[in-house]
């Protein structure tokens, strides 16, 4: 059975009625959760906010791109927007909370804003508790240039994504497991990622200390390959402690993204 501290609260799901909210963060920290993950996107004015998708519904049900709205307008847009927190406010809440051992997996969805996000985490003295996560190699290369040696985690598909995924994502394919430094530096308002046929290779493999892959695409061979150089493997997502237990027995990976509160209740020490 996985340990309590191996479970990652995925967007604070199960701890509040809506994901990625301050209420969910507070509830997860209050419960003693030791790893939380949240996503950062950037508004038109360059403000990092906490949300996963590249767009959201306003109070009238209209979908608006996060990259097209100004941060000052979020509360007035209603709908999903009124629940969105500035990354600065969420990090301040983490820093002020007595749960001082919870690790932060900060998943950056837009590239070209790494210095701003890094500065916010540094402002709240949380760098030592942070793993930088992204589906965008642009983000990870840039973050390593800013702060060499920081923990980096690449999220990637390790089996060919299906039509449903490709409908919503730009899918890039690694050649021979290698993802070289991309020429582009700015990725704003896009949903994209990389398919790596098997384990990562090359420069990016040397830089990352973690990878995150879909739970349904895990294999023992993939995990064993990553473990050869102590690269940690996490998988998303699970709804029960039993599912985590079964997956750990089959694959031997290191961390488990949870979309529910139940695993934390079962595994709480």
Predicted regions, residues:
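Phosphate-group recognition and catalysis centered on beta-loop-alpha active-site segments
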Residues: 1-269
């Amino acid at each position: 059975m996985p340990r309590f501290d191996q479970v990652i609260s995925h967007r604070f799901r199960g701890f509040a009625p809506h994901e990625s909210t301050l209420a969910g963060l507070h509830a997860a920290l209050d419960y003693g959760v030791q790893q939380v993950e949240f996503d950062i996107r950037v508004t038109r004015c360059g403000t990092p906010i906490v949300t996963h998708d590249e767009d959201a519904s306003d109070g009238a049900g209209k979908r608006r791109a996060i990259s097209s709205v100004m941060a000052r307008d979020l509360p007035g847009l209603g709908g999903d927007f009124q629940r969105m927190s500035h990354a600065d406010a969420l990090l301040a809440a983490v820093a002020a909370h007595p749960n001082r051992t919870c690790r932060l997996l900060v998943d950056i969805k837009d590239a070209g804003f790494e210095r701003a996000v890094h500065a916010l985490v540094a402002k709240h003295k949380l760098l030592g508790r942070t793993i930088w996560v992204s589906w965008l190699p642009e983000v990870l290369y840039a973050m390593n240039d800013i702060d060499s040696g920081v923990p980096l985690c690449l999220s990637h598909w390790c089996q060919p994504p299906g039509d449903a995924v490709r409908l919503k994502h730009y899918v890039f394919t690694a050649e021979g497991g290698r993802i070289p430094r991309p020429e582009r530096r700015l990725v704003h308002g896009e949903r994209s990622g990389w398919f790596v046929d098997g384990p990562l290779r090359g420069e990016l493999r040397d830089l990352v200390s973690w990878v995150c892959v879909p739970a349904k695409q895990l294999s023992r061979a993939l995990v064993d390959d990553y473990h050869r150089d102590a690269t940690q493997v996490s998988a998303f997502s699970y709804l029960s402690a039993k599912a985590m237990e079964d997956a750990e027995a089959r694959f031997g990976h290191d961390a488990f993204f949870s979309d529910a509160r139940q695993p934390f209740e079962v595994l709480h020490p």
